[in-house]
């Protein structure tokens, strides 16, 4: 029960740094060697938008990390991890094709990623269409400026579709940003945001001014409010009314009043509907029956005339679109 900590991983090795990443990508557990390598100790505060877990009520790091709390360790071990990104892309293409998917999007494209994708594109190695969405806080504007030729236009199966923002964590990991508290655990705990309202407003306005599509990760309804508020304000301030097809990604705990606002913005609801199958029991425990039974509200969105699509957040779950349809129907 509960999340593992460094005491579990220290049984494997106290000398070799170990990083165990949750399948969602939002949580991690590391051993004592990894904490030491990242220079995380009792004096290290939790960063904005993340958590460094502690043992009991003290300050000793437990090895449990959330969101931005993982960054120091990930950066510290990066040079020790040899990742063949091109090889991963080749393998994933095969998996997507086997599941009947011929167009995919990369929702967190880095400068290194786009260079690899460009090389694969030029070499005829892309067998499916790839739409890249660089993260705005991580050099997204630079990537777009340096690759104008593939912005909105395919070149050898590759194009940049717009920008990506991540506003919160995951509901199953209790880091999604909610307006009402989670059940159990710390009283009044609602998760937390990744960025301030001012930061989000700046990025959203930039995307609108550049007339680029914006995909925004919102698992919690508070994150949804932050996105909707920023987009409504950006439209008002810029007076740009053309349909830029903004997308709310995940929509796990989106409320009906938020769906109504999305209609006015012509916002697309991209729903990770497989949550009801993979983590439905966790959501009921975290949110109770009222909110838990409103996870992934596909029909409520469709009844309002919203454009709805499904995704699997691969590699979080396999890219089986028919399973997503089954989850939505049954």
Which residues fall in each region the model found?
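Catalytic pocket of metal/acid-base enzymes, prominently hydrolases
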Residues: 2-132, 154-208
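Generic beta-strand/beta-sheet core signal
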Residues: 21, 106-107, 131-135, 161-168, ...
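Active-site-proximal loop/turn and secondary-structure-junction residues that shape catalytic pockets
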Residues: 24-26, 34, 69, 110-111, ...
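Distinct, well-ordered alpha-helical segments
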Residues: 115-119, 142-149, 224-238
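Short helix-capping segments at alpha-helix termini
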Residues: 122-127, 152-153, 234-242
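Active-site-proximal beta-alpha core segment in soluble small-molecule metabolic enzymes
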Residues: 129-134, 138-143
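His/Asp/Glu-enriched, well-ordered alpha-helical/loop segment
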Residues: 205-215, 222-246, 251, 256-330
